[in-house]
């Protein structure tokens, strides 16, 4: 039912088959794979790439129909690289999902906590377990691309003095032993992942919209722009700013708010914002998930 929404978006329900290609970052056992499984189930053809940029490129070029990328963590905040990629690529957010992050310390079978002197993880993994790591100041902390790659590194190196901070699923995938569970500083640590597509589609029941825009550097500008949400009775759920490369002191804003592209209030607000900003883009309209606490 290709009914038009706004800005060339049209209503189309997402259908997947066992042949639908979905890309995620990291190696099997990464939280992104868990997010993909949670959103799509097993009836797809998932594959992994190394970086967020590679995933965006795969979706843009058509190698993958959908991509799964982390956008925000409940304890350590935004995944800045992904915000930058959303503005750089002509891809769209078509869904989101939330994954509970439960970090464990993984070592080789037979290794013991007291033998460890090097620990690998993603920088966010190290940050989210800082309280635990503070108790082991003598350990060398090494940042790698993602948590699952860290687990793989421990397996490949075969060194009893090395450990990784990753999921228990990664321990199963790589045949490692869980030396200690529940390392996170916070019990309720979640990462929100967005589902990306090159197609400009939104589902009939979509209730969350993401936009980005650049604001000319004048006082009061952002205030005026945000006024469009308020006047039209729309509630913002998130606002992020990122510096714009090559434009000192200028920022690109990312705003999430509740609504559907077919609603008049939404169209009014977007029209107003577009007229007062540069580089305005609707990143997507999708079904939001409730935060898990």
Annotate each language-model stretch with its function:
Residues 1-293:
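Domain-level signature for soluble enzymes in the chorismate/prephenate branch of the shikimate pathway
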